[in-house]
Amino acid sequence: MSGHSRHDLIIIGAGIVGAACVEAAVAAGLRVAVVESGAIGGGASAAAMGHLVAMDGDPHELALCVYSLQRWQRWASWPESEHQRCGTLWVAREAQELEGVSARVAALAEVGVHAEAVDARGLYALEPALAAGMHGGMHVADDAVVYPPRVAWRLIDEACRAGAQLFAGVRAQALIDGGVRLADGRVLLGPVLVATGVAVPELLPELPMRARKGQLVITERQPPLLRHQLIEMGYAAAAHGADAASVSFNVQPRPNGQLLIGSSREYDVTSTDISPLLLQRMLQRAIAFVPALREVRALRSWCGFRPATADGLPYLGPMPGRRDVWVAAGHEGLGITAAPGSAQLVIDAFLGRAPALSLSPYLPQRALRGDA
């Protein structure tokens, strides 16, 4: 098969980030082509927990989260999102973990996110199933959980109804001057936005991206055990750490009564097989925080690959040295939260508009000159 077609923007990748870019581009009146070799909303979007969270480990990360969470409000109204505002309860297992809580609460308040410190009594009032000996934590009431694959599907479906052209089941083989060549021989002409997560280096080999494998377990349905997304205070350190393999406590109640148990991180592991020893460590960590999980039956486990940059911030913006090539990828574990904001920032910049946030911290050029 061969042929040429011209488009205002060619978006490669239809995970949650790519799908959000498609929506923003179509809303701006662009003639959009979407290329997706696998399932829409597949990859990291399908493997993720679906936690909408104001992550405050880095000011640029937090700014992107807050901007994106505002833009999630419309998507959250869709039945496909399975949106549940369960809130996040950050749990301190050690007394010293409480030392930074007041500063975190203040930092969140500065960007309009309400959070409150809780002592041990308040912690157990919110979640009685926690193990004895916890010291307190932080409660962020407006955080939520969603089901990302169906959101991505709806975004692409609505975009196609509005005129976007979907090239499904075909791989983008190579970027060419002025467009992209597909594996079936067709050539799409126009500016290109690469949003393929861990696969970005296949088209942009000069852009560093590490695959960070994660595993999750889903339980059987059961009477309510937990009401909040529970995360240990040390989660951010594990998420941004450089350890080859790590686990941290992270459990999410799903709207249907199941529990989603995480999380693990492994760098540079390409096998899609479950890592039994790391899975055991992850479950033992969860049971140490919620002993009742020992009696809950696990239904299945799976893994996915987070696209990770060296500095923990995504790549958003034009690619230096390449004409009319843009990128939106590298969100690691925050792609679900950050998708709508990332998309709007990139499309605004593509159109020459002033984005709501400065793109400077996220520009891919930082990785090419060694800043990231």
Question: Over which residues does each language-model region extend?
Answer:
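Beta1/beta-strand and adjacent pyrophosphate-binding region of the FAD-binding site
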Residues: 3-17, 33
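Short hydrophobic core segments
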Residues: 10-12, 187-199, 343
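Active-site substrate-recognition segment that forms the wall
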Residues: 23-24, 52, 81-84, 187, ...
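Glycine-rich FAD pyrophosphate-binding loop
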Residues: 26-46
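Dinucleotide-binding Rossmann-like beta1-alpha1 core, especially the glycine-rich loop
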Residues: 49-126, 286-287
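Short beta-strand to alpha-helix junction loop
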Residues: 63, 91-100, 138-157, 273-278, ...
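Helical element adjacent to the flavin cofactor pocket in flavoenzyme catalytic cores
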Residues: 138-181, 186, 190
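C-terminal catalytic lobe of FAD-dependent flavoproteins
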Residues: 273, 280-281, 287-372
